[in-house]
């Protein structure tokens, strides 16, 4: 892992996620957690009274995240390996925050994802999205024809209201680059 990413997981990521709205004691679902560039800083914020569900379909990423969790003695991260199916075994209204960071472009059935997120979130829960690879940010895959405004409207149509946008240095594929996070709340 490069030094920038290590610093990110130890400090800069923690500061950003606090700005985004993550707090001590929360239960968080990191959808597409990868090797934990967001799950690890989130775990440091929520502390021993909180819980992170780190979900991914990439077996290698899950193994690497498990190594990091063990090495850092993070007991509040629960790894969930999925086969890519959007059916996730979590209780309804049991999650405070859902992170969908740099993964939305890979989701074929976004409407199903939005419905699942809405189902899992508590009333007023935070749905935080980093829509990398949209029309204005390295276009590709399923978001290449959508602007952040289009994505905002799409998400709002599934029972969420827009809360705000946070821009800054974000983790993307083991490097840091400028990007923006869109925050929504469950109605």
Model-predicted segments: where are they?
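Conserved alpha-helix/loop element of class I SAM-dependent methyltransferases that forms part
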Residues: 7-26
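Class I SAM-dependent methyltransferase SAM/SAH-binding core
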Residues: 29-31, 35-86
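A short glycine-rich, Lys/Arg-flanked "PGG" loop and its adjoining helix->strand segment in the class I
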Residues: 43, 111-126
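Short "lid" loop at the C-terminus of a central beta-strand within the Rossmann-like core
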Residues: 58-60, 84-85, 131-137, 170
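A short acidic, Gly/Pro-enriched loop at the edge of an enzyme's catalytic core
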Residues: 85-97
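Short catalytic micro-motifs in class I SAM-dependent methyltransferases
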Residues: 102-103
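Conserved class I S-adenosyl-L-methionine
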Residues: 126-154
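Core SAM-dependent methyltransferase catalytic element
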Residues: 158, 169-187
């Amino acid at each position: 892992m490069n030094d920038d990413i290590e610093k990110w997981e130890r400090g800069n990521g923690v500061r950003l996620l606090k700005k985004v709205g993550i707090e001590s004691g929360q239960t968080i679902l990191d959808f597409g957690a990868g090797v934990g560039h967001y799950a690890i800083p989130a775990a440091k914020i929520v502390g021993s009274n909180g819980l992170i569900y780190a979900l991914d379909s990439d077996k290698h990423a899950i193994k690497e995240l498990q190594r990091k969790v063990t090495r850092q003695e993070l007991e509040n991260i629960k790894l969930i390996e999925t086969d890519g199916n959007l059916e996730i075994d979590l209780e309804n209204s049991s999650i405070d925050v859902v992170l969908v960071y740099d993964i939305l472009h890979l989701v074929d059935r976004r409407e199903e994802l939005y419905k699942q997120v809405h189902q899992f979130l508590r009333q007023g829960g935070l749905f935080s999205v980093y829509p990398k690879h949209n029309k204005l940010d390295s276009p590709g895959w399923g978001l290449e024809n959508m602007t952040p405004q289009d994505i905002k409207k799409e998400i709002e149509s599934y029972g969420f209201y827009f809360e705000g946008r946070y821009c800054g240095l974000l983790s993307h594929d083991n490097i840091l680059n400028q990007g923006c996070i869109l925050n929504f709340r469950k109605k």
